[in-house]
Amino acid sequence: MSIEHQSYVEPLGVKGKVILTSFLGLDANNIFQQNIFLNQLSNFVNLNCSTVVSLVEDSEFDQLCEKKLFVRNIYNHNLKWIHMPIADLKAPDHEFKKKWITTKTLLKNDLLKGNNIVLHCKGGIGRSGTVAALILIEHGEENANAIKCVRKKRQGAIENELQEQFVLDYRTIS
């Protein structure tokens, strides 16, 4: 599968792309399937992805699949894994913001090297869209335009007023 078959945004000034997706490994009935998950990971490797960022909370892992198995398979595919949980339908909280200071640098470096990164939440719309917009802003995009760019590529992204306001208010800090 080519990158064109994915929902992605392209930060300014880098070759890498940010792929937005739902929870990895889910079938049409939202049931985790190991074979689907492994195929997705192989596809991400073929698409020159370097990092998978999980935006779901531990309770969501508990509902969908075994977290240890999930992470082990990501590492087995020589991908990096970053866990940046955000509550469903919410904007990033204080813990996210603290961790984001270092995480955004790691992601920027991946993108500068031309690697693609994968953002996923449960549905691949709200939290993934919000963080994708933050990455665009970190690369020089104006806040409102970052929202437009993400929504153009992923319909329904940044799914509520709380997330939208967070992106509009976001200020990049070095």
Go through each PLM region and give its residues:
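Conserved G/P- and acidic residue-centered "switch" motifs that form tight phosphate/ATP-binding loops
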Residues: G124
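Cys-dependent protein tyrosine phosphatase-like superfamily
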Residues: M1-V118, T130-S174
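Conserved SAM/SAH-binding loop-helix junction
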Residues: R127
